[in-house]
Amino acid sequence: MNRLLDRLTQNGKFHPMWIVLAVTGVLIVASIVFIPARYEGSKEPKQKIAVADHAAAETLPEPDAGQHESKPEPAVIQTTHFTPPAERDMPTGEMGDMIKLGRNIFVHTQVYAKNLVGNGLNCVNCHLDAGRKADSAPLWGAYVMFPAYRSKNHKVNSFEDRLAGCFRFSLNGTPPAYNSKEMLALTSYSYWLATGAPTGKELAGRGYPKLDKPPRQPDAQRGAAVFEKNCAICHGADGLGTKVNAQYAFPPLWGKDSFNAGAGMHSVKNAAAFIKANMPLGKGNSLSVQEAWDVAQFVDSHDRPPDPRVKK
């Protein structure tokens, strides 16, 4: 570079090469100043954006946060596990006698309350193991939840009202008088089964378990196949029950000796839940959800005594 400058300045005259050198010098200086400035400038917006994004993340609500605040989670029903007293612990004396009578009426309704029954059923046909079995509407689970409002009759019911309804609809008969020995005995038996259970608390196993909706619409034709395979051996191919010594060993599921159209079991939803949890007898929960709904639909498709509340 020094030699080039010497040659350009030897004669003291202007040389075109001066222009090239001047432009080159300007470009070099500009690059020294511009490149760091550009580098610094390119970082600043990114930093500002990052800070802005971070601030937004701290101030903006999470997706659906407003929905969670405006729609609180539904209350979860807490259940308490309970085991009824063993029959060997049934008390003695007059109270014990009344409790035993209540059990006999419950299990052998056709014998001990025959004049109040209008079909071939016993209470134990729907409330298994003498009203003790969980998930088959056990007496101990019902007793502690009354008095209670029931949408079925649109009023607050006593436990005696609930028992009366069973006689009227499930047994297609006449409710016992509220001051009768039958009513007192059944109430005493229920009271004893609930010994130690907390009043007003939802006990695990009360009523029938909640059953999932079926994958497909319940179908009576599919249900007929389920019935033939799993139910007919006990309830008969015609569904009219099986008798031993003039008494039903296995109850009729439809026809004149079955529950009437006002009974809770006439609801396909209730019947499906009962069947899923308890049927075939001794093999509860062996049917699929779909099978339980289908066979309940099949049972419900048959004729039975009318609901006494419906005027002819």
Name each model feature, range by range.
Residues 2-103, 109, 147-220:
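Post-cleavage N-terminal segment of exported redox proteins
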Residues 112-114, 130-136, 193-198, 233, ...:
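Secretory-pathway/luminal and periplasmic proteins that interact with or process carbohydrate-rich
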Residues 94-130, 214-250, 268:
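Sequence/structural segment immediately N-terminal to covalent heme-attachment motifs in c-type
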Residues 110-118, 174-181, 199-203, 283-289, ...:
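Surface-exposed patches in mature extracellular/periplasmic domains of secreted proteins
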Residues 121, 125, 181, 185-188, ...:
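Amphipathic alpha-helical interaction segments
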Residues 124-133, 191, 234-241, 254, ...:
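Detector for the c-type heme attachment site
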Residues 43-45, 89, 116-121, 132-133, ...:
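Short sequence/structural segments immediately N-terminal
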Residues 96-101, 105, 133-176, 186, ...:
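Extracytoplasmic electron-transfer domains, predominantly the class I c-type cytochrome c fold
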